[in-house]
Regions:
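Activation segment signature within eukaryotic-like protein kinase domains
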Residues: 30-31
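Catalytic-loop of the protein kinase fold
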Residues: 42-59
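Conserved activation segment of eukaryotic-like protein kinases, specifically the C-terminal portion
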Residues: 82-100
Length: 191
């Protein structure tokens, strides 16, 4: 069994204290690694359901892996849209968060696209080194508002438009417009 050096949340906090922003190639490397793992799960009809920086472990040589499969669930294709509420509130997709707010037990949603939203928020946190950005996004009701908020937090000189557009597609409020892991994998082949 491998032993992780840290988790991504701890690393992001270290970088925030040191004011050491991720370089684009680092973000892309991490994104590719995590996308491959989550694409594998999606291909095998498994949704993680609790993606957050604390559940992303860092191993030697900057290898990032998804961990804590305690909330993971095999998804029946016929019932894919109906799922119980799982996940960490700050990293929940809009549909799951709405269900939590209104105390709903089951929510109609695509669990892979909910995982994608959670992963997108992890990357926003890493890119901005600021958890506040996630709190602001939680209150947004349309993508234009999100883009306006992110302009205040993102240093667009550090990251290409291409990368920013990928992150936007990961956190699109409309799950029908949001990437799944197959689509993200295809997009990442262009980097």
């Amino acid at each position: 069994m491998e032993r992780a050096q840290s988790d991504w949340n701890i690393e992001i906090k270290r970088r925030k204290i040191a004011k050491k922003f991720y370089k684009e190639y680092e973000i892309i490397s991490i994104l590719k690694q995590l996308s491959q793992g989550l694409f594998f799960l999606q291909k095998n009809k498994i949704a993680h359901r609790d993606i957050k920086p604390q559940n992303i472990l860092i191993f030697p040589n900057n290898i990032y892996k998804i961990a804590d499969m305690g909330e993971a669930k095999e998804i029946d294709k016929n019932k894919m849209q109906m799922a119980t509420l799982r996940g960490s509130e700050l990293f929940m997709s809009p549909l799951l968060y709405e269900g939590l707010k209104y105390n709903k037990k089951n929510i109609r949603h695509n669990p892979y696209k909910s995982d994608m939203f959670s992963l997108g928020l992890c990357f926003l946190y890493a890119i901005c080194l600021n958890l506040k950005v996630l709190e602001y996004i939680r209150e947004m009701t349309n993508m234009n508002n999100i883009k306006n908020i992110l302009e205040k937090f993102l240093d667009t000189n550090k990251y290409s438009d291409k990368l920013i557009k990928i992150v936007y597609k990961m956190i699109d409020l409309d799950e029908n417009k949001r990437f799944d892991f197959n689509e993200l994998e295809n997009e990442l082949t262009q980097f």
